[in-house]
Amino acid sequence: MTGTRILELFGPAPEPPSELGRYRILSPTAGIRVSPLQLGALSIGDAWSTDLGSMDKDSAMELLDAYAAAGGNFIDTANAYQNEQSEMWIGEWMASRGNRDKMVIATKFGTDYRAHELGKGLAVNYSGNHKRSLHMSVRDSLQKLRTSWIDILYLHTWDYTTSIPELMDSLHHLVQRGDVLYLGICNTPAWVVSAANTYAQQQGKTQFSVYQGRWNPLRRELERDILPMARHFGMAVTVYDALGSGKFQSRDMLARRKDQGEGLRAIYGGQQTALEEAMSKALGVVAAQHGIESVTAVALAYLLAKAPYVFPIIGGRKIQHLHDNIEALSLRLSQEEIEYLESVGDFDPGFPYDMAGVDPADTGIATPIVAQAAPMAFVQRSKAIGYAESSKGSQMFG
């Protein structure tokens, strides 16, 4: 009996209910294990239903249950989402399910999260990057989430009004106290993050281990400086707007939404642009190559193939959409497929990359200043888990 127990203890875990439960290391500087797709909780709540659609508490609990049942453990929220309902409902869900220790919760500070109750202009120190805002936000998030710690705390947006030493010293204090485990930053220029992490490393403080930003096949600005910066500092990248604000949809999907009385989210505009329609068609072509219909799965697979330590955030309000998105984890996109999707848009890295070139570790091609000296060969950087060396249908992308 004892031997059996020992074998069970050290034996492998069973296969997960879906690929969502095949966990990954968050980043080289954050060893916590997380699901490859993060559940975005922007829609958890009904306070912003006019702009984001309606989701009552029962539906929210069902969505959270479905995500967890599929093996998901990684949830993204913020202090202000849905006028604080998002954090409160997640906290209520974890308390009722008794699963706090199983979940990895990321939340954010920096926005004015109390104006909805106190009034505009009457909650000035509830927002900003400064120590007082941070103190109150973490105090309140812990209470709303019904937890004693936050797994990942993001600075929501850089506001240029707080010094890097004040920010990093204050964040490090929370880590030392055990209120926060890992640090992240969103919507911030690469030079600021670089300066902050350099300060942290030099002063023996906790650095940012994850960056959150906008990225999809039509919005590739993150690749210019933020992605190389994240790689340099050992940071993960969590991605919002991965599905083009919900506009990467086939004509059939849009027709079904219309038949069901649903439109695109009002806050993002009610119609696809010509470029969004073209991208949706291209995503459909790649989906067909893989024998599936879901263009959203391909859009997510694109990000998962681009670089290691990338975690798309999936939002939405329907369980069926969740399962469609999980399909992305079974896809592997080739370089030909990636380039085919990127050919729809127009991304120019600009100066100084048009002069200096890009890292040969990514391309295998020497930069002009290196090539002028001698022929060179380069060790290639590791590819993402979602990357495939070749595609059976690659000839159609030529």
Curated annotation (Swiss-Prot):
Aldo-keto reductase; part of the gene cluster B that mediates the biosynthesis of austinol and dehydroaustinol, two fungal meroterpenoids. The first step of the pathway is the synthesis of 3,5-dimethylorsellinic acid by the polyketide synthase ausA. 3,5-dimethylorsellinic acid is then prenylated by the polyprenyl transferase ausN. Further epoxidation by the FAD-dependent monooxygenase ausM and cyclization by the probable terpene cyclase ausL lead to the formation of protoaustinoid A. Keywords: NADP, Oxidoreductase. Homodimer. One of its GO terms (biological process) is terpenoid biosynthetic process. Coiled coil: none annotated. It holds the Pfam family Aldo_ket_red. It comes from Emericella nidulans (strain FGSC A4 / ATCC 38163 / CBS 112.46 / NRRL 194 / M139). Pathway: Secondary metabolite biosynthesis; terpenoid biosynthesis. This is Aldo-keto reductase ausK. Its EC number is 1.1.1.-.
